């Protein structure tokens, strides 16, 4: 919010200074002169020291979004085609690990056993479990049962029971690229209430993903998730 206010204030001051009546003693300036001065003093969105004049159509569009008050990503976080390929390969391993868990998870299994499945499969596929050792985190995955919200730590004394729902959160590093996803599992015969919760959550994910597209807004994704959850009585 603070950054947004700063952006709006700077835009207001800029426009006020440009639109105020000129002093009768100042030399007349053309609109072209005003535009050139504005371009000299406004830094490029990408952080370069070049003048604001857009270098590509992409830069022009980003600059326009910034002028409208939107927060725009710095060029440093934009990925090259090669980086996107690397992230996708890491994601393939991440999904393969979750598929491996799906093939073995069952009632009576401890969450520590799930953790070992994740560790062994990730290493077999050439990856590294990203959580392991991160800021002292002791395990390769996170397991959250029933009402546990997220990031539960696997343990030898926590076993799955028939009727549980459990989220397994997997993060993978492969060739220095990170990927992350989680999956909900229904253990045995779960109640209709739990099944409906899992189904609606998956539907929310799919609707949110439909909003992930070039020139879309991050808020559109969140709004799609929120609207669908609320429609079904969830928050």
Residue locations for each model-derived region?
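Active-site neighborhoods and metal-handling regions in enzymes and metal-associated proteins
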Residues: 12, 16, 20-235
């Amino acid at each position: 919010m603070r950054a947004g206010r700063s952006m709006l204030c700077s835009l207001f001051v800029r426009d006020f200074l440009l639109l105020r009546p000129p002093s009768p003693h100042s030399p007349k300036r053309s609109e072209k002169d005003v535009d050139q001065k504005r371009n000299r003093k406004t830094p490029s969105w990408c952080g370069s020291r070049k003048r604001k004049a857009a270098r590509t159509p992409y830069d022009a569009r980003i600059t326009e979004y910034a002028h409208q008050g939107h927060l725009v990503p710095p060029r440093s976080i934009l990925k090259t085609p090669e980086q996107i390929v690397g992230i996708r390969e890491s994601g393939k391993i991440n999904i393969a690990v979750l598929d491996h868990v799906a093939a073995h998870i069952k009632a009576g299994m401890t969450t520590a056993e799930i953790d070992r499945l994740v560790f062994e499969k990730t290493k077999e596929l050439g990856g590294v479990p990203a959580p392991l050792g991160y800021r002292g985190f002791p395990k390769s995955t996170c397991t959250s049962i029933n009402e546990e919200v997220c990031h539960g730590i696997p343990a030898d004394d926590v076993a799955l029971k028939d009727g549980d729902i459990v989220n397994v959160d997997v993060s993978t590093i492969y060739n220095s690229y990170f990927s992350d996803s989680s999956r909900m599992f229904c253990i045995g015969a779960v109640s209709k209430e739990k099944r409906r919760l899992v189904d609606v959550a998956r539907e929310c994910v799919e609707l949110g993903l439909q909003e992930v597209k070039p020139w879309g807004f991050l808020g559109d994704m969140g709004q799609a998730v929120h609207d669908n959850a609320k429609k079904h009585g969830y928050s």
